[in-house]
């Protein structure tokens, strides 16, 4: 990828509960920690990212970036500063919203747990997008059959993934609605891989 590409990234899977919002917020926090400007756009009618931001603000520790509600018409609007990273949280359904988010993005993060149903839904989603994409495995447990099967599934279907995998951690669940993500979540490493893809590391 080129460092001249718009810095738009969408977290996508038509299966719910795989960690799209956590990935969006976790990556945004990691980018801010490295000194980058970030904006999150929430196109999910359930408003999970928006709710996260509201909870953090009510707790007195607001997120260090804006979370904007967006729709299919506004999700691709360029930020005021072209160096701003725009991370898009998408719904598990509403194909028009997912399509608009994908169309606006230079990179699609296909978020999936190692579960077979989640992987199959991810692969189906991948076949319908026309953007550079990479799978991010979440809620993983090292040494398990499910993780080995997931890696074999991706290899068999020739689907690329992030080297980093997000572990199943109680700390990640507890981070919901806060402005702090535990250091060992893996999102810092995911962010480093993203920056490498843009030629910024």
Predicted regions and their residues:
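Short, well-ordered beta-strand core segments
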Residues: 86, 108-109, 133-135
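Short, well-ordered alpha-helix to beta-strand connector turns
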Residues: 83, 104-106, 158
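Beta-strand-loop-alpha "switch" segments that mediate conformational coupling across diverse proteins
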Residues: 141, 151-183, 193-198
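Conserved nucleotide-binding/hydrolysis micro-motifs of P-loop NTPases
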Residues: 45-47, 116, 140-143, 170-171
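P-loop/Walker-type NTP enzyme "switch/lid" segment
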Residues: 2-18, 25-99, 127, 167, ...
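Conserved C-terminal guanine-recognition region of P-loop GTPase G domains, centered on the G4
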Residues: 119-138
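Inter-motif core of Ras-like GTPase G domains
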Residues: 93-116
